[in-house]
Amino acid sequence: VLGLPDLYETTNTGYHKTLGQWSILDYGPYNNDGNTPPSYSAYERFFMGWLTPRLITEPENVVLEDLKNNNEALLISSTDEHNLIGNDPNPTACYMLENRQQTGWDEYLPGHGLMLTKIQYSSNNWKQNTVNNSSNRMGVDLIEADGKKPNSRQNGYDGKPGDLFPAGATEYLGIADHSIEEIS
């Protein structure tokens, strides 16, 4: 769609967890029996040049409004700098933080709150449409708030309310003391 890569596993050889219902480029088009796909995520908008996230380099208190109403997101980089170019990022590893609420196109998401996505960009994987084919190095990976990362989609996993950080969950977002590679 529009030059975006698929975010589900495209080889169908393994059944590891991808973004599921949270992304229109994965299982999201099937939300509400296929009638109500979700809004594009912050990363998808960033990749297309429709959103420029605010780079966070120091600890701070932030009010992040609903993505679909305000088109705003935060980017946490592995360094204090980032070129903010979604389809050619430098550095290639970063996090996107967005607020998803169950209204409008997002009404049929499995839950609401702050969605934290880890990005590990590889131009080859994006060009070959193999972004999330390796469970060992996902290109776009949801960081589950409850810490419960399913290891398989074979049992019908496509998203759950505990995937997103609830409002006021500041104690969960202490990622500043860790490198990008350490957080999963």
Report each predicted region and the residues it spans.
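The catalytic-center signature of Zn2+-dependent metalloproteases
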Residues: 1-50
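Non-catalytic C-terminal accessory/binding modules of secreted extracellular proteins
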Residues: 54-184
